[in-house]
Amino acid sequence: MQIISDKTEFKLKGVSAVAIGKFDGIHAGHYRLIDEILRQKKNGLQSVIFTFFPSATVYFGGEDAKELTTREEKREIFERMGIDVLVEFPLNPETAATDPVDFVKKILIEMMNMKFLAAGEDVSFGKGGKGNRVLLEEMAEENDFTVKIIEKIFDHGKEISSTYVREEILKGNMELASELLSR
């Protein structure tokens, strides 16, 4: 697996299927995103995970924001799953201020040769988190890429998310937390 870390300028060779997200505590929703891009390999697209480092949770949440999965653990999981490229894009004042349209055009399309994008229904990106699924769907038509929005997954009426996993860990419910993080 190729890892592109801490670079704001790069160019991927070939065309890409990209999954975008925080990927903290890789759970069922993340696995659905990853499965979508891995399926695109049969169409000749390389599988790419795009995430920010540090994550938006840590960057905007301050030092108290705790992640479930370390950078190294995420890398190991993605490698095991057969991901071709991992992009750990630096999140800093300059990149956080990127216009959402510019983010899609310059980073996802131009730098990553994206032809397919998988994202969660609550995806947000760009300045002020203004980029969302509606913008992606509009831009897909205009810019020759396909977007697949993955709906939320629920367990016992509760949305499966990194926050849910974190809550269960804090309650001491390690069995459920482990189940939520397993494939």
Describe the function of each predicted region:
Residues 1-183:
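Nucleotidyltransferase catalytic core that binds NTPs
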